[in-house]
Amino acid sequence: MGISRSDLEETMSKPPDCLPRMLRGTPRQRVFTLFIISFKFTFLVSILIYWHTVGAPKDQRRQYSLPVDFPCPQLAFPRVSAPGNIFFLETSDRTNPSFLFMCSVESAARAHPESQVVVLMKGLPRDTTAWPRNLGISLLSCFPNVQIRPLDLQELFEDTPLAAWYLEAQHRWEPYLLPVLSDASRIALLWKFGGIYLDTDFIVLKNLRNLTNMLGIQSRYVLNGAFLAFERKHEFLALCIRDFVAHYNGWIWGHQGPQLLTRVFKKWCSIHSLKESRACRGVTALPPEAFYPIPWQNWKKYFEDVSPEELAQLLNATYAVHVWNKKSQGTHLEATSRALLAQLHARYCPTTHRAMTMYL
């Protein structure tokens, strides 16, 4: 998908054929051209340095030393009967869920024992006999209402305006293509099937089935699509898909995600600011405490000790907790500590928490 690291390095090592032509012209034009070339070169070098030095997150690298099987606990779940699914997506080729990923799915499965929790992973082949064996897939398979399935993006985007966009996106390089793919996938998924979508860095505290045609406010200026709950073929999602393609810009972080949802909601409600309205025409934007009780700027609070009383007060009006994995990944967590995140693991995903205490 896109341009590989080796392709990018090879491209950068060759001077462009058009460079001599670009350097013709007045001295001012040459200075401007050299500035643009230098800026782009610096940007690409910085990304290559990031690839070489950072690599996979620490917790992801640690996963490969874990056992591949997990003894399933005794679970007394009722038969799945509730309509609608709860979806999780992995749009990269990773097939080895992190502990936070496992906790997200487990907490959703426990909070919705009568609902189907569907985990779609792009890296899984259709042939289940060729699936990798790892702790994450083994643990999540313990839950009778969890289904793990391969994700075919071309099939998902079929018969939507996203199909042509995705075809082109596979042949160009962009810095934020993976998160952009995730942004596109979630709105296409809910538009086609309806249900609830959650990012894999959520911990679900309460049943979400009574939430329909809703999303969450991240701050007073912006919405967030880490949680979405919509009916199938809802016009708001159709508008999001059209806006995604019509105003596409993959070079600005969040332009196809939170910013897209924010501008579409403003258009939907005919408002200029989120302060003017939080519900209109059947779509509701829930307050930050519902899904984002701790702002991303304060993500370290998840790793600080809290008392049970403070925890209860903090999450009194919260349905699910977004952990801001983009910021927190790789941060050490002592599973048996009184840290806020450790307490959430112990209470809402006890099977994952037990695995953490055994293997971390």
Swiss-Prot record:
Organism expressing this protein natively: Rattus norvegicus (Rat)
Catalysed reactions, semicolon-separated: a beta-D-Gal-(1->4)-beta-D-Glc-(1<->1)-Cer(d18:1(4E)) + UDP-alpha-D-galactose = a globoside Gb3Cer (d18:1(4E)) + UDP + H(+); a beta-D-Gal-(1<->1')-ceramide + UDP-alpha-D-galactose = alpha-D-Gal-(1->4)-beta-D-Gal-(1<->1')-Cer + UDP + H(+)
Motif (DXD motif): 199-201
InterPro entries noted in UniProt: A1-4-GlycosylTfrase_dom (IPR007652), Glycosyltransf_32 (IPR051981), GlycoTrfase_DXD_sugar-bd_CS (IPR007577), Nucleotide-diphossugar_trans (IPR029044)
The protein's name: Lactosylceramide 4-alpha-galactosyltransferase
Lumenal side: 52-360
Localization per Swiss-Prot or TrEMBL: Golgi apparatus membrane
Enzyme class: transferase
